[in-house]
Amino acid sequence: KYYGNGVHXGKHSXTVDWGTAIGNIGNNAAANXATGXNAGG
């Protein structure tokens, strides 16, 4: 399952695509604050 911001989780593990995650942090910071961290994806 893809949760947005570069985070992918399976039944037994989760992984982070750090390139995507770091690229999205700045883009989503304000939106995350406004939505309780549900922005992006």
Curated annotation (Swiss-Prot):
Compartments where found: Secreted
Statement: the UniProt record of this protein carries the keyword Secreted: yes
Keyword Transcription attributed: no
Gene Ontology terms: biological process: defense response to bacterium; killing of cells of another organism
Source domain of life: Bacteria
Assigned GO CC terms: extracellular region
Location, primary (coarse class): secreted
Annotated keywords: Antibiotic, Antimicrobial, Bacteriocin, Secreted
Signal peptide: none
Entry similarity comment: Belongs to the bacteriocin class IIA/YGNGV family.
Function: This heat stable bacteriocin shows activity against species of Lactobacillus, Listeria monocytogenes, Pediococcus, Enterococcus, Leuconostoc and Lactococcus.
The name this protein goes by in its record: Bacteriocin bavaricin-A
Lineage: Bacteria, Bacillati, Bacillota, Bacilli, Lactobacillales
